[in-house]
Amino acid sequence: AIVGDVIPNERRASAMGIIMASFSLASVIGVPIGLYLATLSDWHFPFFVLGGLALTALVPIYFYIPKINAHIDSKEDRENPIEIISKVFKNKNQLLALGFGVIIMLSHFSIVPFISPYMVANVGFTEEQLSYIYLIGGALTIFTSPLIGKFADRYGRQKIFAITVLMASIPVFFITQMGETPIALVLLVTTLFFIFGAGRMIPSTTMVTSSVKPKNRGSFMSFNSASRQMTNGFAAYIAGLIITEDANGLLQNYELVGYFAIIMGMISIYVGSRIKVVDQNDFEN
């Protein structure tokens, strides 16, 4: 919501790309550091450090994040949460944006929770080798995320979103079909999934942010975030019902989940194409 209010629409995807890259950087650096800190004391210690860093971050946030209160200073009464949710379901564009986010999460989080167990059970990875998947994939997205953001601003969010979804479908297909495979080939496929799977979140988040007027953006994005979190759990639950384990310990039916994820991705392209950008300077309903 802050990015949507502060960054002009023509540069918003680039800003989202940088933010996504910072998440990747935090993961690549933070996870090893967290594990190391745990060895120095116990598992509580990394969380104390994280809390301390969060408190420290409040200082630059206070001084450098601009105040965004133009839409609050109006004399209108504040809406209660029920009214906010009701307005979302009455606004076709916001409803499309909400459904768009849900469909993307169904596509993404039906696959992600089972990558690690599938790699160990079916592909031949050891528990120690799993870290290579996230280390290499996360490291490369540090560089690719800003590029995808710039492309989205230059060539259009819907077009770049469609391209990243189509490209992400390729590694999704192979990841969910793999048997025992050389580690280098597996890392190539999983890295492509990280690049394009995370990459599609950049134009899609920008599209959702731009679908709401500044006055309603914060409340809508909170509702959108909650719906996505619920969908994440639902997607993993559905995938868990489909995937089974045979007598040899191999996971079965992961390919069916892959087909489901690809279909959801195709549907998201269509739904995303119908989302409209609202006037970013209009603070009225």
Task: Describe the function of each predicted region.
Residues 1-22:
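Cytoplasmic helix-loop-helix junction between adjacent transmembrane helices
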Residues 60-62, 259-285:
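Multi-pass alpha-helical transporter architecture, strongest
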Residues 39-51, 243-263:
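A membrane-interface helix-boundary motif in multi-pass transporters
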Residues 18-65:
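Helix-loop-helix hairpin linking two adjacent transmembrane segments in secondary transporters
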Residues 145-156, 243:
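Helix-to-loop junctions at the C-terminal end of transmembrane segments
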Residues 158-203:
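C-terminal transmembrane helical hairpin of 12-TM major facilitator-type secondary transporters
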Residues 66-98:
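Juxtamembrane intracellular "pre-TM" segments in multi-pass secondary transporters
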Residues 94-134:
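Extracytoplasmic gate region of multi-pass secondary transporters
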